[in-house]
């Protein structure tokens, strides 16, 4: 699969066929696609997320969709958000090594990121809902935030590098808009998209 192919969403059934020749993925899980076990584990609103296990390891394959996953194509979103996620992850890895999954491959045309599978890690939200005690969470999040925010700031970066970062991420309008509205604004008033406040 190359970035020049028309976008096509992956599925559990098509992933091995479409990514079986991807050297980055095969180098982490093995080339024999008949031994690949593919599970779709995405529990979010926006992306497809697969765990792919093979003879020699496992990886995560994440693909953006051109719409909000839980709503459908009536709420379109640009695929370029995977471009911003890829660049954010590479910067976070450089600024706070070991704090985010390693990136194995990025295909901009397919809005696809292949990354390290961090087992037995789980999504933080799940641990919090289950009431798990996480004694190091404040320290770990604090260190990650301090390292990435300071090392990505004017105080640490060369001016030309900082301006290049600002220019790169300035076009990430749609995903920022969703976060700002759906997470920080809409839950607190009778917003048009809120279903729980409708009769």
Model-derived features: where do they sit?
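Short regulatory "switch" loops immediately downstream of catalytic or recognition motifs
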Residues: 23-25, 64-68, 150-157, 189-199
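Active-site catalytic-loop/activation-segment of kinase and kinase-like phosphoryl-transfer enzymes
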Residues: 1-15, 116, 160-199
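Juxta-kinase regulatory segment immediately upstream of eukaryotic protein kinase catalytic domains
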Residues: 1-38
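Residue-level recognition of the N-termini of beta-strands and the immediately preceding loop/turn
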Residues: 36, 101-102, 164
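ATP-binding glycine-rich phosphate-binding loop
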Residues: 31-54
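A short, hydrophobic secondary-structure junction motif
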Residues: 44, 81-93, 171-183
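ATP-binding pocket architecture of kinase catalytic cores
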Residues: 50-160
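Glycine-rich, flexible loop segments associated with nucleotide phosphate handling
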Residues: 32-36, 76-83, 199
């Amino acid at each position: 699969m190359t970035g020049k192919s028309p976008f096509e969403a992956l599925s559990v059934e098509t992933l091995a066929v479409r990514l079986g020749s991807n050297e980055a993925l095969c180098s982490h899980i093995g080339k024999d696609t008949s031994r690949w076990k593919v599970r779709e584990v995405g529990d979010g609103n926006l992306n497809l997320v697969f765990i792919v296990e093979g003879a020699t390891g496992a990886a995560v394959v994440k693909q953006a969709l051109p719409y909000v996953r839980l709503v459908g194509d009536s709420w379109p979103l640009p695929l370029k958000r995977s471009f911003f996620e890829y660049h954010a992850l590479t910067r976070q890895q450089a600024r706070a090594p070991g704090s985010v999954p390693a990136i194995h491959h990025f295909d901009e045309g397919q809005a696809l990121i292949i990354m390290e599978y961090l087992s037995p890690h789980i999504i933080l939200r799940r641990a919090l809902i289950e009431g798990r005690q996480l004694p190091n969470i404040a320290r770990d999040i604090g260190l990650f935030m301090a390292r990435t925010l300071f090392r990505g700031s004017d105080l640490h970066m060369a001016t030309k590098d900082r301006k290049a970062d600002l220019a790169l991420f300035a076009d990430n309008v749609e995903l920022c808009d969703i976060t700002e509205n759906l997470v920080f604004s809409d839950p607190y008033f009778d917003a048009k998209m809120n279903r729980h406040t409708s009769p």
